[in-house]
A protein has these predicted regions:
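Extracytoplasmic "Venus flytrap"
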Residues: 49-68, 72, 76, 80-99, ...
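Hydrophobic alpha-helical segments within soluble ligand-binding/sensing domains
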Residues: 92, 153-180, 226, 274-278, ...
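Hinge/cleft segment of the Venus flytrap/periplasmic-binding protein
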Residues: 185-189, 204, 301, 305-366
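Short, solvent-exposed amphipathic alpha-helices that sit
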Residues: 61-76, 162-166, 192-211, 225, ...
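Bacterial N-terminal signal peptides
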Residues: 26-39
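Hydrophobic alpha-helical
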Residues: 109-131, 201, 215, 219-281
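Sec/Tat signal peptide C-region and signal peptidase I cleavage site
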Residues: 39-45
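Flexible loop/hinge segments that line or gate small-molecule binding clefts
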Residues: 122-161, 181, 276-283, 287-288
Length: 366
């Protein structure tokens, strides 16, 4: 046994005190942040976040999602995060995962997948996290929402009917109705609405053999790409009588190309989505028709359903299949009603009844 000299005792005590003091300070540096994290975590847990994942804010139609979501977030007094994929599927999924991690899965989602194929990895991610969500527009036809407990619903508009309507209106503008040449612009080829709208166009063409589709390009829903593609196609086909496009952003790009070729107003254009510029183009005699899809309502309905499920006010598992994959009606727009539609939906915002999630239900998606 070692015996410390008496004179050494105070020095050893001081040493032990210094060690203990350092340990105590080290403990405090660990405990204080932990307490702060716990406190903020409990505070955060009391406030669910809302989140929307959309393609971009450079599209006037997509901006309506944001406007609607912001109005709903203000109404329910919850924070909102707006995520954009910028046409990058991996970015979309990564951002969704980051949002789940940031909120501790305390989030209700509305999602417009970048591509139909993206719906599955998104569903698996959010289902594993126990996070409720609603998707819009794109998913693979063979993927069923009810196979994922937290995937509340997939909602869309009738894309085939949209393609039929806009193509029919375009053909009416020909010098000889049902006789003429057209070019066309598709969106993203992997998107469900693009495929459906294209199918509608093909139906009309099959019923009107006197109309020839000379060329088409995929402009990826983008205005600039549509402008460039239209310019190129006009070089090869300067004698067309119409331009069919799968959305309004591409329609506006096509109109710009037609203006530069001195064909605007002579060659009509159709689109889909119902952005303000397209309404003005219809009024100005540059476009024949569009379809108004109410992006503000889309976002609010999706968030309201997700939040209700999270709060236990919507029992997802008890919903029939027809309420988990369904369509709601859009508004056909031409020169006859463009002023009224613009007044009702653009210059003003309707009061949406979100107490009945299926008030606008039109038909089930198989």
């Amino acid at each position: 046994m070692r015996i410390f000299p008496l004179l050494a005792v105070p020095a050893r005590a001081a040493f032990l005190f210094r060690v203990s003091e350092r340990a105590r300070l080290r403990m405090l540096t660990l405990v204080i942040p932990l307490l702060a994290f716990t406190a903020t975590g409990n505070l955060h847990a009391a406030s669910t976040s809302l989140a929307i994942s959309i393609r971009t804010l450079s599209s006037p139609y997509q901006v309506m999602y944001k406007v609607g979501a912001e109005a709903y977030a203000k109404q329910v007094g919850l924070p909102l995060d707006v995520l954009t994929t910028e046409a990058n599927s991996q970015k979309g999924l990564t951002d969704i995962k980051a949002e789940v991690a940031r909120t501790g899965a305390n989030v209700a989602f509305y999602i417009d997948p970048n591509d139909a194929a993206d719906a599955v990895p998104i569903a698996k991610t959010l289902d594993a996290a126990g996070t409720y969500f609603v998707t819009w527009w794109s998913k693979p036809a063979d993927v069923k929402v009810w196979d994922y407990p937290h995937w509340i619903a997939h909602i869309s508009f009738d894309g085939v009917a949209a393609g039929v309507y806009t193509a029919t209106e375009l053909l009416k503008t020909f010098k000889t109705p049902g006789q003429g040449k057209i070019i066309a612009l598709q969106g993203r080829l992997g998107d469900t609405p693009n495929a459906e709208r294209w199918q509608g166009l093909q139906q009309v063409l099959s019923q009107n053999p006197g109309v020839k589709l000379l060329q088409w390009e995929s402009a990826l829903w983008d205005r600039t790409k549509a402008y460039n593609s239209t310019k190129e196609m006009l070089v090869a086909h300067p004698d067309i009588e119409g331009v069919w496009t799968a959305n309004d952003d591409m329609a506006m790009g096509a109109i710009q190309a037609l203006k530069e070729a001195n064909l605007a107003g002579k060659v009509m254009v159709t689109g889909c989505d119902g952005i303000p510029e397209m309404f003005d183009a219809i009024k100005g005699g540059l476009a024949a028709a569009t379809i108004f899809n109410d992006g503000k309502y889309q976002a609010q309905l999706g968030l309201a359903m997700s939040l209700a499920a999270k709060q236990g006010k919507l029992d997802v598992k008890s919903l029939p299949h027809e309420h988990r994959q369904f369509e709601i009606p859009a508004v056909n727009v031409n020169r006859e009603n463009v002023d009224q539609v613009k007044h009702d939906y653009i210059e003003n915002t309707p009061t949406y009844d979100l107490s009945d999630f299926f008030a606008k239900w039109s038909k089930a998606i198989p």
